Regions:
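Conserved nucleotide-sugar phosphate-binding/catalytic loop shared by glycosyltransferases and other
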Residues: 4-54, 224-225
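Short, polar loop motifs at secondary-structure junctions
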Residues: 13-18, 80-87, 162-163, 207-215
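Conserved nucleotide-sugar donor-binding subdomain of glycosyltransferases
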Residues: 45-87
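Active-site-proximal region of nucleotide-activated glycan assembly enzymes
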Residues: 91-157
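Donor-nucleotide binding loops and adjacent catalytic segments primarily
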Residues: 145-147, 156-243, 253, 294
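Nucleotide-sugar donor-binding patch of glycosyltransferase catalytic domains
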Residues: 225-228, 258-307
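A donor-sugar binding/catalytic signature common to diverse glycosyltransferases
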Residues: 233-276
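C-terminal amphipathic helix plus adjacent low-complexity
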Residues: 298-329
Length: 329
């Protein structure tokens, strides 16, 4: 959209806003309160902790909707693109909801899943369109997360999306530890990885997913630490690595597929979406899967290096046709 000369406004807060500002310093970022979900230290507490915060999430959805109605009086946006935020739709704009999780997995059984899907679809159908960054065919990434038995009538599969580009660079024979996600699980995984990596005869680069300021850098002879990388720098770092160890975040999966990079996936404990996605990718023969509670880094690295996993080719340009069909010139 920027390349087509459109005026873009972003909205967010905290770490999200800081990352957007670093990537797009010339774009205005409006403060918009996030859902501010807190996460437990123990994975088995994840579902009850989230369930207890449902009233807070519903309140946040209502608040963001009224925030948008107020901002529309002064900005009058033509198009609103909502990244998984259910309240950001407006009748005077083309409102687009983006998500790969149309039918959330509760971890509480099929009845709970059906109820969540029903509620999710009711919200999504208030938008003009629902864009799913995946393919519609059987050879898809997200499985039943976005190919459920019931889907919104405004859904459009726009193909996987990634800003990464394949690089013609030499493999520098290091393993990339790519940390991300909410605390405290980000730090828990970091500590587990560093403890085991320090005893393995390999060279590691650890991108911690943290802002550089006020952060202490751990010490290790075979591990290089980087607090944060912009997308272009991260693109090059992934391209130069021999394999990546990371969470099963959907954006990360799309990036790795586009770059054709081997990876060990470690789902965030308790996050049913990541657990499902990691299991699915392993069963399809695409990636190596490790469970955080039973992490065996040495075994996982050997499996990943020795694997003959083949990810089929995906078209990462489908979304461009979808944007063109909207008349964005």
């Amino acid at each position: 959209m920027l390349s087509k000369g459109w005026h873009i406004t972003l909205a967010g807060e905290g770490k999200t806003a800081n990352l957007l500002s670093a990537e797009f310093p010339a774009i205005q970022i409006l403060p918009l309160r996030g859902y501010r979900i807190s996460y437990p230290k123990r994975g088995w507490l994840f579902i009850p902790t989230i369930m207890l915060q449902i009233p807070k999430m519903l309140s946040a959805i209502v608040n963001e909707h009224f925030w948008l109605r107020k901002k529309m009086r002064s900005h009058a946006w033509d198009i609103i693109v909502s990244d998984n935020r259910y309240g950001l739709f407006h009748k005077k704009a083309t409102s687009i909801f983006i998500s790969h999780q149309i039918a959330p997995i509760s971890g509480l059984g099929s009845m709970a899943d059906d109820l969540l899907a029903f509620i999710s679809i009711r919200f999504i159908q208030r938008f003009n369109a629902c864009w799913v960054p995946d393919t519609a065919d059987i050879n898809n990434l997200s499985g039943k997360l976005s190919h459920a038995k019931t889907i919104p009538n405004n859904i459009e599969y726009i193909g996987p999306v990634s800003r990464m580009e394949r690089k013609n660079v030499a493999d520098e024979n290091f393993i990339l530890l790519l940390l991300s996600g909410p605390e405290p699980q980000r730090t828990i995984l970091e500590n587990k990885l560093l403890d085991q990596a320090s005893r393995i005869n390999e060279r590691f680069v650890c991108v911690r997913g943290l802002p550089a300021e006020n952060q202490l850098t751990p010490s290790s002879s075979n591990i290089q630490f980087i607090h944060h990388l912009k997308s272009g720098e991260l693109n090059l770092m992934i391209a130069k690595s021999k394999l990546v160890i990371c969470r099963t975040g959907y954006s990360t999966v799309m990036d790795l597929i586009k770059l054709g990079k081997k990876a060990i996936m470690i789902p965030t404990p308790g996050q049913t979406e990541q657990a499902y996605l990691g299991k699915r990718l392993k069963e399809m023969g695409w990636y190596t899967l490790q469970v955080q509670q039973k992490l065996d880094l040495s075994k996982g690295i050997k499996q990943c290096i020795d694997s003959q996993y083949q990810v089929p080719p995906f078209n990462f340009d489908t979304y461009r046709k979808v944007i063109d069909q909207m008349g964005i010139q």
